[in-house]
């Protein structure tokens, strides 16, 4: 199973978490991400604005998405960023953290194989090759991509926000979403 193979490799390369914890995170997070996106429109007409009659929300591809990866969670972040990019008809380039460059390459190669098996161009997702993985290569990618996403520490997020291109960042202590059906029961 690819999950076990990738989790073991991620643990051995990064020394973060246990292999079992990484397997659990791969299963839970990638499944949740897919379930959130499945069946939702991501391009074209999305909805009408309630408070602005006649105004419609339209979604369109942004182009090539540069994705800066963390060392702590390379597999799941690659999967999530890749799913979001491709679902919205974008391509993406993965910039691995240097301490997770080999498992990141392996993950992207597996995703590329599956994309090609579905009849789509494998080049919808690409990775900075391990031998070229560096801050300079990541900075060049950020400057060339149409929009960038960073997941990681403050330095990575700052690099995305400072590169002169639109960017989204999430780092330590940030949360992208909280979903709670009954918030009245929270302590």
Regions found by a protein language model. Name each.
Residues 1-55:
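N-terminal Rossmann-like NAD(P)+-binding subdomain of aldehyde/semialdehyde dehydrogenases
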Residues 47-186:
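Rossmann-like NAD(P) dinucleotide-binding subdomain of oxidoreductase/dehydrogenase enzymes
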